[in-house]
């Protein structure tokens, strides 16, 4: 995904709004982060998720569509749709584990059928909404250019240009690491299953399922990167807002000290009118960022619902099987010993759950940044003396406050209208996994006394 990484510097923002300190970015962290971002961008093009004509993820140029990659995405959609039934049938015929009883067959349906359907839906969305996806990218870059023009200090501009911070690059590296870890279980099956060496199509089907999982995860990775960039813009919008309000407060203090000198008072009124204009332009950028946030979330809502259904089921099943093979009396009676922990399965769970965190938490923190804008306006507006405030600045502040008061209802974002992606849904997922895991463990203890 094309993102303007800017100068390789890291930013440290103090708790006091408006103060920014720029420090050098360590080389050892910059190179892995940039490489990971380039790999993610290339993978989205290879799997037909992005049809951009821009070959490099750097730069701030306008993103253009590529007809060749649009056709490539449609071919990927047709291939996944046609090959998915054959892939599941081949896996069902060769993987005897799935045919032992109905419970294991249901597990196979979750792992394979649900995943194949989710991958097909993901490619369908990316094929038929590619123009909207690229439009969101161009609107992000346009908002960045507009916001940068409003930055009237060198520190704010340097901070705006610097996206390659430690936190951002670390998030990119963690995202790529979660993809690698979530491929651990498919790699183990390809390595240990004897049927893989006997039947070539069975091996191809397993690889195909892994690719479908990667397609779903990469689509959500694009969402994470877009929210990361959007959060960067919102944070600097809040910094600029705090700076404007601080300048207005300084003007009021100077106006009160100047007394009744007419020339001085006219100068301060002119400065207030200029700040009112800057505040109005910032409000327009803030409105565009809110619309972008809603558009990006709606584009990835279906994929988020699919992933939030897939991950808890996989985590519950793998945790129970880890317990069953290690501590169940059924295994001890049948084999006389317990099996060691499956570290491939543990890595798979860690990768999936980390990926889930990187889908939910950036959305939650992005909404918190938008809520922070309301607090900044509220705190700054209280310091404005009404008798010396020009009507342009006063009316702009009132309009900004009313807009922020109502905007939460107008731009309410949810995943397909089902739930919000916040820390509450994360705690619900963890609680559901633990509850069903306890039920399965108690069920095993009752059956195998």
Swiss-Prot record:
It is found in: Cell membrane. Residues 51-70, 126-205, 322-340, 444-449 are extracellular. GO terms for cellular component: axon; dendrite; membrane; neuronal cell body; plasma membrane. The keyword Cell membrane applies. In larvae, is expressed in dorsal pharyngeal sense organ. It comes from the Eukaryota. Keywords: Cell membrane, Membrane, Receptor, Transducer, Transmembrane, Transmembrane helix. GO terms for molecular function: ligand-gated monoatomic ion channel activity; taste receptor activity. One of its GO terms (biological process) is chemosensory behavior. InterPro entries: 7TM_chemorcpt. Residues 1-27, 94-102, 229-298, 364-420 are cytoplasmic. The chain crosses the membrane at residues 28-50, 71-93, 103-125, 206-228, 299-321, 341-363, 421-443. It is a multi-pass membrane protein. The keyword Nucleotide-binding does not apply. Probable gustatory receptor which mediates acceptance or avoidance behavior, depending on its substrates. Belongs to the insect chemoreceptor superfamily. Gustatory receptor (GR) family. Gr77a subfamily. This is Putative gustatory receptor 77a. It comes from Drosophila melanogaster. The lineage of its organism: Eukaryota, Metazoa, Ecdysozoa, Arthropoda, Hexapoda. The gene is Gr77a.
């Amino acid at each position: 995904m094309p993102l303007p990484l800017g100068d390789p510097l890291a930013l440290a923002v103090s708790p006091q709004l408006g103060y920014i300190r720029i420090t050098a970015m360590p080389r050892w962290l910059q190179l892995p982060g940039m490489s990971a971002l380039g790999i993610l961008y290339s993978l989205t093009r290879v799997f037909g998720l992005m049809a951009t004509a821009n070959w490099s993820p750097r730069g701030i140029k306008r993103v253009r569509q590529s007809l060749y990659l649009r056709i490539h995405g449609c071919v990927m959609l047709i291939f996944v749709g046609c090959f998915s039934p054959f892939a599941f049938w081949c896996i069902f015929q060769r993987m005897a584990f799935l045919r032992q009883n109905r419970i294991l067959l249901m597990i196979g349906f979750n792992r394979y059928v649900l995943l194949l359907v989710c991958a097909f839906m993901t490619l369908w969305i990316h094929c038929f909404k590619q123009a909207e996806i690229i439009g969101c990218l161009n609107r992000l870059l346009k908002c960045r250019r507009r916001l940068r023009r409003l930055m009237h200090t060198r520190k704010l501009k340097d901070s705006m240009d610097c996206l390659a911070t430690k936190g951002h690059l670390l998030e990119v590296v963690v995202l790529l690491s979660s993809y690698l870890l979530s491929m651990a279980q498919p790699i183990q099956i390809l390595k240990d299953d004897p049927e893989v060496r006997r039947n070539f199509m069975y091996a191809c089907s397993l690889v195909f399922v892994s690719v479908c999982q990667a397609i779903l995860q990469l689509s959500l990775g694009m969402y994470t990167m877009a929210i990361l960039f959007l959060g960067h813009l919102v944070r600097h919008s809040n910094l600029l807002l705090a700076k404007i309000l601080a300048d207005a407060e300084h003007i009021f203090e100077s106006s009160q000290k100047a007394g009744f000198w007419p020339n001085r008072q006219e100068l301060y009124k002119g400065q207030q009118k200029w700040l009112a204009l800057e505040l109005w332009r910032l409000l327009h950028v803030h409105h565009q960022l809110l619309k972008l946030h809603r558009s990006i979330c709606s584009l990835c809502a279906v994929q988020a619902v699919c992933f939030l259904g897939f991950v808890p089921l996989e985590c519950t099943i793998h945790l129970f099987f880890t317990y069953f093979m290690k501590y169940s009396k059924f295994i001890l009676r049948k084999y006389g010993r317990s099996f060691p922990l499956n570290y491939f399965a543990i890595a798979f769970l860690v990768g999936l759950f980390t990926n889930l965190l990187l889908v939910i938490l950036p959305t939650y923190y992005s909404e918190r940044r938008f809520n922070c804008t309301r607090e900044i306006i509220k705190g700054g507006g209280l310091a404005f003396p009404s008798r010396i405030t020009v009507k342009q600045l006063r009316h702009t502040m009132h309009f900004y406050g009313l807009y922020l008061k109502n905007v939460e209802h107008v731009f309410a974002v949810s995943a397909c209208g089902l739930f919000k992606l916040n820390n509450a849904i994360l705690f619900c997922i963890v609680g559901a996994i633990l509850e069903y895991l306890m039920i399965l463990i108690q069920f095993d203890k009752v059956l195998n006394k």
